[in-house]
C-alpha cells in the first residue's frame, strides 16, 4: 500500500495580530506570527521540557537543569501547584523545595528560559488538580468568574508574582511566558479574566498560553489574547479500562493539532453549537508531548524510547513549531502536612496514581537517570536548532 501526506495549504502570513510579545532590556523582542515564534524578528523553534521544581530536591535543581540543557531543551516549564504552597489557608510557603525564585534563577544560570504554569487549577496528577483542600471545602464555584473565587485567585497570582518579580524577560530575566489554567475547554471569558488578573499582578511577559485541546473542536479561548498549545501521548493511562487502545493517530503525519483523548476523563465530548478553534490564527505549538507516561493503578503502561522519538518527530514534520514535552524530567510527590499530594479517586478524581512516584517513565527519571529517549530526542533537538 502506498500512502502520501498532503500538507495543509498555508494561508496568508499574519503578524502582530496577537496581543502578545515583548522585548528585554537589550531590545531583543519575542513575538509570534500565525505560523511560528520569532526572536529579534527571525523565526525560531524552541524546545520546552516540563520539570516540576516542587517534586525535586532544591539542591538537585542545578544539575538536573544542566542535563535538560545538554539534552537540547531551551525552555523549562513548571507548574506551581497551589496546594504545595498554601496547604493551610494563609500560610504560604516559598522556601526549600518550594522556592520558585531560586528555581527560576537556577534556570537562568543554566541558560534556560522559563514558562510558569501558574494555575490556579493545574491537574498534573496532583491532589484536587492542585487546589488546596481548604479552597475546595469553601463550597464556592471554582474555575469560573465567581467573585469569591476570583478574589482568592488574585491573592494566589499576586503571591506567585512577588516571588519572581524582577525575573521576567522585560527585566532581563528568564521568564518568557505564563500558562493560565489547564484543560479549561469551554470558558473563554474566564481565561480572559485570568489573563487580566495575571497582568494586573505584574506578569507582563511575551507569551500567554492556554491548553487548546478539547474532545470536540478545540478549546474556547479568548480570541487573539493567548496562544493555544497542544498535546499528544503514546498511551492513555487515564482510560477507564485495561484493553488495548485503538491505533494512535499521532504516529501519522497530518495537520491535526487537537488531541481528543487527553483529558477525556474530565472533559465533555461535544461542542453542540458548532464551535471551532480558529487554528489558522495561531502557530502550531505543543506543551505536552509525552516522552513518557505516568501509570495509573489500573493501567500501568511502559513507553519505549522510539514511542517518544517517533511521536515528537511526526509532530515536528506535521508543523509543530514549539516542541514541548510533559514530562521531560520526572519527580517525587511531596507529602503534605495534612495529606498526601497525589490525584486519587478518594478526592473525587477518576484515577488513582502512586502516592510518591511521579517518574513518568520519561527522558530524565525521578532521580535524574538519562533514559534512551533522552539521547534519541536530543538528535531531533539538534536538528531543530540547526534547521528550525
Task: Describe the role of every protein-language-model region.
Residues 90-98, 109, 120-144, 158, ...:
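Aromatic- and acidic-residue-enriched segments that line the glycan-binding/catalytic groove
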Residues 3-12, 138, 149-167, 171-179, ...:
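Carbohydrate-binding surfaces of carbohydrate-active enzymes
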Residues 219-297, 353, 364:
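Glycoside hydrolase catalytic-domain groove-lining segments
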Residues 61-128, 133, 195-200:
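Aromatic-lined substrate-binding rim segments of carbohydrate-active enzymes
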Amino acid at each position: 500500500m502506498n500512502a502520501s501526506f498532503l500538507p495543509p495549504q498555508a494561508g496568508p502570513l499574519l503578524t502582530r495580530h496577537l496581543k502578545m510579545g515583548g522585548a528585554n532590556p537589550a531590545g531583543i523582542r519575542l513575538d509570534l506570527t500565525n505560523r511560528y515564534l520569532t526572536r529579534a524578528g527571525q523565526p525560531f523553534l524552541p524546545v520546552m521540557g516540563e520539570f516540576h521544581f516542587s517534586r525535586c530536591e532544591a539542591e538537585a535543581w542545578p544539575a538536573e537543569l544542566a542535563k535538560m540543557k545538554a539534552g537540547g531543551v531551551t525552555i523549562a516549564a513548571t507548574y506551581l501547584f497551589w496546594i504545595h504552597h498554601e496547604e493551610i489557608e494563609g500560610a504560604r510557603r516559598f522556601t526549600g523545595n518550594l522556592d520558585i525564585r531560586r528555581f527560576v534563577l537556577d534556570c537562568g544560570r543554566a541558560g534556560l528560559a522559563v514558562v510558569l504554569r501558574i494555575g490556579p487549577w493545574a491537574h498534573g496528577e496532583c491532589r484536587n488538580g492542585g487546589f488546596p483542600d481548604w479552597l475546595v471545602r469553601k463550597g464556592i464555584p471554582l474555575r469560573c468568574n465567581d467573585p469569591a473565587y476570583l478574589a482568592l485567585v488574585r491573592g494566589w497570582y499576586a503571591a506567585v508574582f512577588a516571588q519572581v518579580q524582577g525575573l521576567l524577560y522585560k527585566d532581563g530575566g528568564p521568564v518568557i511566558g505564563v500558562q493560565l489554567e489547564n484543560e479549561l475547554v469551554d470558558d473563554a471569558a474566564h481565561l480572559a479574566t485570568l489573563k487580566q488578573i495575571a497582568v494586573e499582578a505584574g506578569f507582563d511577559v511575551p507569551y500567554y498560553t492556554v491548553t487548546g485541546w478539547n474532545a470536540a473542536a478545540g478549546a474556547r479561548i479568548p480570541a487573539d489574547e493567548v496562544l493555544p498549545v497542544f498535546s499528544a501521548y503514546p498511551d492513555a493511562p487515564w482510560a477507564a479500562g485495561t484493553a488495548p487502545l485503538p491505533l494512535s493517530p499521532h504516529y501519522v503525519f497530518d495537520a491535526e493539532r487537537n488531541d481528543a483523548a487527553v483529558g477525556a476523563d474530565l472533559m465533555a465530548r461535544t461542542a453542540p453549537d458548532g464551535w471551532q478553534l480558529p487554528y489558522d490564527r495561531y502557530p502550531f505549538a505543543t506543551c505536552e508531548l509525552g516522552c513518557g507516561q505516568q501509570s495509573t493503578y489500573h493501567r500501568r503502561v511502559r513507553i519505549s524510547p522510539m514511542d517518544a522519538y517517533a511521536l515528537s518527530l511526526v509532530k515536528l514534520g506535521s508543523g509543530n513549531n514549539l516542541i514541548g514535552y510533559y514530562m521531560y524530567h520526572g519527580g517525587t510527590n511531596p507529602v503534605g502536612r495534612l495529606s498526601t499530594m497525589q490525584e486519587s479517586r478518594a478526592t473525587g478524581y477518576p484515577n488513582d496514581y502512586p502516592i510518591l512516584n511521579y517518574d513518568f517513565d520519561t527522558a530524565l527519571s525521578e532521580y535524574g537517570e538519562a533514559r534512551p529517549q533522552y539521547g534519541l530526542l536530543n538528535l531531533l533537538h539538534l536538528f531543530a536548532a540547526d534547521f528550525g
